[in-house]
Amino acid sequence: MKLTHQDFNLFNREIFTFKQLKEQQTSAEIDALKQTYKQHWEKWKALNLAITQGLPAELGITKPKIESWTNGWNLRSHFWAAYRSEQRQAENACLALLLNKKQFQVYLMFQHYKSEERAGSVVAYNQLLNRLEAWSQTIDCEGYYIWPQEEHELVDHLPLKDYL
């Protein structure tokens, strides 16, 4: 299963709210758009489930949390999924996958949403930055970036080699 230009182009639009879409498009056009979103999201879901099945069992990651293609009021401007092992379901840190109009990202993140219900502080999470230099010695840094999440997901991220 491969991501195609159409998967990225799905998000290349100005309007994501159903209220605004209804002002500019017919019901039939909106229904067609919803159907297209659902088709791409089903592919996204299948991709994430396939990734999970391909992971080593000792990681304990059996089911990703896959965000829906809509929240009821808006189409998503990206598709997103979080991965946590069974032992880490109650922790804020997770691996995540993001697909938007610009890129496909795999990243470690601190999930702020409902963070008060899970364990792990921002301070403890940020301590992981201290391990980046040693880890970077084991990989080719090309293609790795730092995303502080304070910047928008579409802003170019800082290359890891520049950060180090």
Regions found by a protein language model. Name each.
Residues 2-12:
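N-terminal targeting/trafficking signals and adjacent low-complexity tails
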Residues 5, 26-30, 37, 117-121, ...:
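Short, structured coil/loop segments at alpha-helix boundaries
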Residues 11-62:
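Active-site acidic/histidine clusters and adjacent loop/turn architecture
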Residues 41-44, 69, 73, 80, ...:
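A residue-identity detector for tryptophan
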Residues 49-67, 97, 130-152:
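Short, charge-rich amphipathic segments
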Residues 62-95, 99:
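Amphipathic, interaction-prone secondary-structure segments
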Residues 102-163:
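Compact, glycine/acidic-enriched structural inserts
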